[in-house]
Swiss-Prot record:
Marker of a cell type preferentially transformed by neu or ras oncoprotein. The keyword Transmembrane helix applies. Residues 66-87 are annotated as: Disordered. Residues 1-20 form the signal peptide. The chain crosses the membrane at residues 39-59. One of its GO terms (molecular function) is ATPase binding. It comes from Homo sapiens (Human). The gene is FXYD3. Associates with and regulates the activity of the sodium/potassium-transporting ATPase (NKA) which transports Na(+) out of the cell and K(+) into the cell. Reduces glutathionylation of the NKA beta-1 subunit ATP1B1, thus reversing glutathionylation-mediated inhibition of ATP1B1. Induces a hyperpolarization-activated chloride current when expressed in Xenopus oocytes. Belongs to the FXYD family. This is FXYD domain-containing ion transport regulator 3. It holds the Pfam family ATP1G1_PLM_MAT8. Changing residue 63 to S: Abolishes glutathionylation but does not affect interaction with ATP1B1.
Length: 87
């Protein structure tokens, strides 16, 4: 009895596959042209990569690592001094 029930369940679970559309149905709203999508993505990635390299190498993007930030007006005293942590 269990084998018959299992066979029936497997048949019913696979039944919707028989009614499925063909994968190459180009009129289906769920058909995607994956090759064109991949080529377009690679072109976009190449253009963005080239633009990033050009921006990094250009003279207009100068980073000044030698300057100290002007945020701090002076050196602040340490909050914990030696000997102040005793109770």
């Amino acid at each position: 009895m269990q084998k018959v029930t299992l066979g029936l369940l497997v048949f019913l679970a696979g039944f919707p596959v028989l009614d499925a559309n063909d994968l190459e149905d180009k009129n289906s709203p769920f058909y995607y042209d994956w090759h064109s999508l991949q080529v377009g993505g690679l072109i976009c990635a190449g253009v963005l990569c080239a633009m990033g390299i050009i921006i990094v190498m250009s003279a207009k993007c100068k980073c000044k690592f030698g300057q100290k930030s002007g945020h701090h007006p002076g050196e602040t005293p340490p909050l914990i001094t030696p000997g102040s942590a005793q109770s």
